[in-house]
Amino acid sequence: MRSRGVKYVSVRARLARSRVLAYLALTKPRVIELLLVTAIPAMLLADRGSANPLLILNTLLGGISAAAGANTFNCVADADIDKLMKRTSRRPLARAAVPPRNALVLGLALTAGSFFWLWWTTNLLSGLLALATVAFYVFVYTLLLKRRTSQNVVWGGAAGCMPVMIGWSAITDTIGWPALAMFAIIFFWTPPHTWALAMRYKDDYKVASVPMLPAVATERHVTKQILIYTWLTALSTLVLALATGWLYMAVAVVAGAWFLTMAHQLYVGVCAGEPVKPLRLFLQSNNYLAVVFCALAVDSVLALPTLF
């Protein structure tokens, strides 16, 4: 009897753990990492490294909640196509691990919680920016652009740029030009980052009838666009140097040259008809963004004198 009872409790524990992990997966934790990588340096730059740690923590909690809410809504809206794509077929709603209604409630709770938390702990502007981010990601990108245009990630990617705006506004209660410069960096970085991954999974997008650029254009055209946006990314990091010290400037130049080299190699390889590995660019683009923004954070904490 005791053994049977222990097994019953063990099964219930596993089911509970599986259910919790399914709800957590709805929020796409790995996507939220971008928030941490970009929001903290933005806040440090806004206060030249002397930002209140509690304010940073409160802003991150609100921002994470907003991102989690947006990702949850995205899973609900994309459940039909997630079932068709190998890369996303194991997502909770695609495999019916979570009822859609429960996912909607979770998304609403996270979004509302984010707004009120940021309003209470930082300022109204930050709360409104978080609310606008969720609305833009869900209604403009997910519902309007994603299934209608190959430029979906170009314009829809603006939602991923908002953490720096929220971080900056949490410190200053304004939107200054450095925040816009950081916004531009992430805006131009998003297409090459996303298209490199989409090149690897373009057949998935074709099956799901999602007009991601690699699924509807030639590899030559896609890699040319990747190269153009990589150049724009590297150049936009130099604009931010007007508000930073020599450390950020040096890292931005070196990292930009490295990122451009990888994009050029991908384009040249495709033009030459050689086998290419776009997934490598996707993975390294994450490292590039992390390096640039970490350099920004260190530069700000050290309060190095601005170059201009």
From Swiss-Prot:
It is found in: Cell membrane. One of its GO terms (cellular component) is plasma membrane. Pathway: Porphyrin-containing compound metabolism; heme O biosynthesis; heme O from protoheme: step 1/1. Signal peptide: none annotated. GO terms for molecular function: protoheme IX farnesyltransferase activity. Keywords: Cell membrane, Heme biosynthesis, Membrane, Transferase, Transmembrane, Transmembrane helix. It is a multi-pass membrane protein. It comes from the Bacteria. It is an enzyme of class 2 (transferase). InterPro entries: Protohaem_IX_farnesylTrfase (IPR006369), UbiA_prenyltransferase (IPR000537), UbiA_sf (IPR044878). It catalyses: heme b + (2E,6E)-farnesyl diphosphate + H2O = Fe(II)-heme o + diphosphate. Its EC number is 2.5.1.141. One of its GO terms (biological process) is heme O biosynthetic process. The chain crosses the membrane at residues 20-40, 53-73, 102-122, 124-144, 149-169, 170-190, 227-249, 254-276, 288-308. Its main location: membrane. HAMAP family: CyoE_CtaB. Converts heme B (protoheme IX) to heme O by substitution of the vinyl group on carbon 2 of heme B porphyrin ring with a hydroxyethyl farnesyl side group. Carbon 2 of the heme B porphyrin ring is defined according to the Fischer nomenclature. Belongs to the UbiA prenyltransferase family. Protoheme IX farnesyltransferase subfamily. This is Protoheme IX farnesyltransferase. It comes from Mycobacterium leprae (strain TN). The gene is ctaB.
